[in-house]
């Protein structure tokens, strides 16, 4: 009997320290070589705004009732008419939402903003030099165009002389939500992570971008080599994957708050991203933007990604994209009208 009790106690102790796969218990799966397993497809869309709305003032978290009401408002908005009241206005956007993501989730902790530092939930102020450059650019719309979508070109405020006068995502160069850094968007908000012993691949659905991140401690490439996605190097900090990126091209922005805004230039950007498993179904993603040329202080964003069954299909951008061709053709037609008028 005593032997049976001892064996039973030993089994219970063993079970107590064995990992389980229960959802929500903070269990972190491992790869065969012992690293935290971040692999899978992760949906990073969220209703939580980047910056804290003014009505919440210094409050960092929503109540359950407020969170429920926010979700309900979004669900009701799906039935709104997208057409302009004036039938003569542009019909762009006047169609249903079959191609957009159905976003009904807030951040798991019900935060009022994705920005967690500074505590006020707002983007830091621009430096004086960055502000002056921003104002000068908006007055002239000169190249390079760093915005993902340039509304001035779409609405004829800045007639397109060439494709360089359109936004970067319209030219299939940079997706505003896929980053880096990664932010929720209207659609294609999926990240797939692949791992080997020496590398991690971060593949985003938008613009089908793949960042291959070495983990072997090699230095960054020369600052003379500038890239749209920067030069990334990774390492493990406990169970958290840390990815640091520098050497961004000045042709892109330092930060993209949304699809139409571009803040600063990427040349001085130092981006630090942190990926960690919360549980089987949840991945936490944090990033810190440190750009002393653009912002008066660094800021940090935190969001949670939910596991998705997938698969991720290849993102078609140039294929069947007649919008850019038609916009350029329209600009040439306007020029002919002006030239004919002047020559009379």
Residue ranges and their predicted role:
Residues 9, 20-344:
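PEST-like low-complexity, intrinsically disordered acidic/proline/serine-rich tracts
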């Amino acid at each position: 009997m005593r032997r049976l009790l001892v064996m039973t106690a030993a089994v219970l102790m063993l079970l107590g320290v064995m990992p389980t796969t229960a959802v929500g218990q903070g269990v972190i799966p491992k790869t065969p070589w012992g690293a935290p397993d971040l692999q899978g497809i992760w949906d990073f869309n969220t209703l939580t705004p980047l910056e804290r709305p003014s009505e919440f003032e210094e409050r960092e978290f929503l109540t359950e009732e407020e969170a429920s009401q926010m979700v309900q408002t979004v669900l009701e908005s799906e039935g709104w008419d997208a057409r302009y009241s004036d039938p003569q206005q542009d019909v762009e956007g006047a169609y249903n939402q079959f191609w957009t993501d159905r976003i009904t989730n807030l951040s798991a902790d019900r935060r009022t903003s994705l920005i967690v530092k500074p505590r006020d939930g707002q983007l830091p102020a621009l430096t004086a030099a960055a502000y002056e450059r921003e104002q000068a650019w908006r007055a002239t719309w000169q190249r390079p165009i760093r915005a993902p979508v340039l509304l001035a070109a779409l609405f004829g405020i800045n007639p397109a002389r060439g494709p360089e006068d359109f936004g970067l995502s319209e030219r299939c160069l940079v997706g505003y939500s896929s980053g880096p850094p990664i932010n929720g968007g209207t659609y294609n908000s999926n990240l797939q992570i692949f791992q080997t012993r020496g590398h991690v691949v971060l593949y985003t659905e938008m613009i089908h971008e793949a960042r291959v991140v070495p983990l072997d401690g090699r230095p960054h490439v020369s600052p003379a080599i500038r890239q749209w996605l920067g030069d990334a190097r990774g390492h493990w900090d406990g169970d958290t994957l840390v990815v640091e990126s520098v050497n961004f091209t000045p042709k892109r922005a330092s930060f993209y708050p949304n699809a139409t805004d571009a803040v600063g230039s990427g040349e001085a950007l130092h981006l630090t991203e942190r990926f960690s498993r919360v549980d089987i179904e949840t991945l936490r993603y944090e990033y810190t933007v440190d750009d002393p040329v653009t912002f008066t202080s660094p800021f940090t964003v935190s969001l949670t990604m939910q596991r998705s069954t997938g698969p991720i299909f290849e993102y078609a951008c140039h294929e069947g994209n007649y919008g850019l061709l038609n916009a350029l053709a329209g600009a040439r037609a306007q020029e002919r009208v002006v030239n004919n008028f002047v020559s009379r």
